[in-house]
């Protein structure tokens, strides 16, 4: 770590989940990793080892796909023993009534423009999910202490819940010089990268984060990136993975 750098931040999107493979909107639905997703978690751990990027503390969401990916990666990197903090504010964006629906079918039914608004606009949430329905989380015990469980979210809602947690909690570990691993989701990580890199509400629509490839940020004492945009530990695979994410909704 150079003299100007504070902590090192590593962002990791969970490996491929069962619903990623089926091209379904997932959101807060708690699905398992596929075999490919498990392999991605292992590869992430190998990349951490190869780059001697050894986390001191782990933050994850409350969702199995992020927890499992982190466990596999840390076990592979021989860092399975580090402290772990899990928080709902790192959860994926809640996709409302779209949860459990096929992306290509939603696109066909509502058209490209509406599909992209729901999927990528900053402040247009999908329709709300019916409380008590199959893919709603309003009675899930892990959210019992929330005043209100979301019924839908746009990316702006994720920013509003996540950035105070970043500033109040995660930042302290980075300012103490720790290497912090955050294993989370496409949209919670997009919200954080938007904040770190000062990306506009419009331009964030074009940012896609691939599954299973660690993204390193070196931060100064104000937690501003010394390497804006971060550095993927496998840039070639990251570019291919981001392109695949951008194309979701295709047949």
UniProtKB/Swiss-Prot annotation:
Catalytic activity: (2R)-2-phosphoglycerate = (2R)-3-phosphoglycerate
Molecular function terms, GO-annotated: phosphoglycerate mutase activity
Pathway: Carbohydrate degradation; glycolysis; pyruvate from D-glyceraldehyde 3-phosphate: step 3/5
Database matches in InterPro entries: His_Pase_superF_clade-1, His_PPase_superfam, PG/BPGM_mutase_AS, Phosphogly_mut1
Record-linked Gene3D superfamilies: Phosphoglycerate mutase-like
Site (Transition state stabilizer): residue numbering on this chain: 185
Leading EC class: isomerase
One GO-annotated biological process of the protein: glycolytic process
Recorded superkingdom: Bacteria
Active site (catalytic residues): 14, 92
Function of the molecule: Catalyzes the interconversion of 2-phosphoglycerate and 3-phosphoglycerate.
Family (UniProt): Belongs to the phosphoglycerate mutase family. BPG-dependent PGAM subfamily.
Name of the molecule in the record: 2,3-bisphosphoglycerate-dependent phosphoglycerate mutase
Organism: Rhodococcus opacus (strain B4)
